[in-house]
Each structure stands twice: as structure tokens, then as C-alpha cells.
Curated annotation (Swiss-Prot):
Residue numbers spanned by region Disordered: 60-105
Protein name stated in the entry: Securin-2
Organism this protein belongs to: Homo sapiens
InterPro entries: Securin_separation_inhibitor (IPR006940)
GO molecular function: SH3 domain binding
Length: 202
């Protein structure tokens, strides 16, 4: 094998001068050098260079050969097994289709209790009407805030109210006595504040 020779400049003559810009252009292109009648493409390399051996040792060849053979055998053994699995005879296929047809559940007549699983009508939940004794459609409820009625008498007074008129406006029961609201609402309104400290200079 011919030895590789690295030249510092593109032109192998030691006396030639090359500008810095030309050196960058020349380094990007490989140089062709004729050695012993064989043309070789040479590129500039830095550092130590080692020649690769022409051939691998026999021991490594044997090791790689056995590994390659083992993988080829495993591939070959796996291939036929996959091909053998889907091959079935026509009789076996017909028997399987008959079995699958027989395993299909019977018609709905055999299970009438499935229809009675829901004992109620689902459409009952779609109606939002109140019972007849609790109808509030005739009441003027436009702009009515949340009411808290303690007694049934106040509820009857509310039912006796007529349509609202600007001339005669009765005082609604939910606005008259605000202090008579339940104590639970008042307890939610109580907030404990920290003690006042007068020592701080402003």
C-alpha cells in the first residue's frame, strides 16, 4: 500500500507564496497527488494520523462470522414459524365459523326482563312543573329577591297579593322587618375585627 504524504500548501513547491485568502480557498478543496502512478485525493489533516490495517485479523473475522451466522439462523427459524401458524384446513375453518354462529346470543324474546330494567319513565325528569297545589304562575314575581318566610301566614299573604300597580303598592313582607331575619344570617354577618391600637404614630 502506498504511503500518504501531507503537503502544507496546495502547490507542493516550497518557494511559492500564497495569500491568506487563497489559503482558505485552497484548503477547502482536496489536493490530488500522483504517487507511484496511482492518483490519490488528499485533504489537509492535523494531528497524528494512523494507517488503517488492510484487513481484520482472523480471530475477529471468526467472531463476527459466528455472530452473523447466529442472527441469520434466528431470523430463518422465526420466519417459517410465522408462516405455519395461519395455515389451517378448510374443515377447521368451517367448524370455527359454526361455533361462532352458535355462540351468538339469542334474540330479545329470550330476555324480556331487560326491557323492564328501568321501572320509571325517563321523560318524567324532563318536566319542571310544580304540583297543582303549589302553582306560582299567577304570582307577580318579576324582580323579587330571595325571600325568607318563617311562618305559613306570610306565605298566604304573599298569595293574596294582586298584580303590582304604581298607585297602590303594598309593602312586601320581605322588606318590612329586616331585623326579624333568622339568627343564622346575622351570625354570618358578624366579623371579628382586631383591637384598635392607638400607640402607632401616623
Amino acid at each position: 500500500m502506498a504511503t500518504l504524504i501531507y503537503v502544507d500548501k496546495e502547490i507542493g513547491e516550497p518557494g511559492t507564496r500564497v495569500a491568506a485568502k487563497d489559503v482558505l480557498k485552497l484548503e477547502s478543496r482536496p489536493s490530488i497527488k500522483a504517487l507511484d502512478g496511482i492518483s490519490q485525493v488528499l485533504t489537509r489533516r492535523f494531528g497524528k494520523t494512523y494507517d488503517a490495517p488492510s484487513a481484520l485479523p482472523k480471530a475477529t473475522r471468526k467472531a463476527l462470522g459466528t455472530v452473523n451466522r447466529a442472527t441469520e439462523k434466528s431470523v430463518k427459524t422465526n420466519g417459517p414459524r410465522k408462516q405455519k401458524q395461519p395455515s389451517f384446513s378448510a374443515k377447521k375453518m368451517t367448524e370455527k365459523t359454526v361455533k361462532t354462529k352458535s355462540s351468538v346470543p339469542a334474540s330479545d324474546d329470550a330476555y324480556p326482563e331487560i326491557e323492564k330494567f328501568f321501572p320509571f319513565n325517563l321523560l318524567d325528569f324532563e318536566s319542571f312543573d310544580l304540583p297543582e297545589e303549589r302553582q306560582i304562575a299567577h304570582l307577580p314575581l318579576s324582580g323579587v329577591p330571595l325571600m325568607i318566610l318563617d311562618e305559613e301566614g306570610e306565605l298566604e299573604k304573599l298569595f293574596q297579593l294582586g298584580p303590582p300597580s304604581p298607585v297602590k303598592m303594598p309593602s312586601p313582607p320581605w322588606e318590612c322587618n329586616l331585623l326579624q331575619s333568622p339568627s343564622s344570617i346575622l351570625s354570618t354577618l358578624d366579623v371579628e375585627l382586631p383591637a384598635v391600637c392607638y400607640d402607632i404614630d401616623i
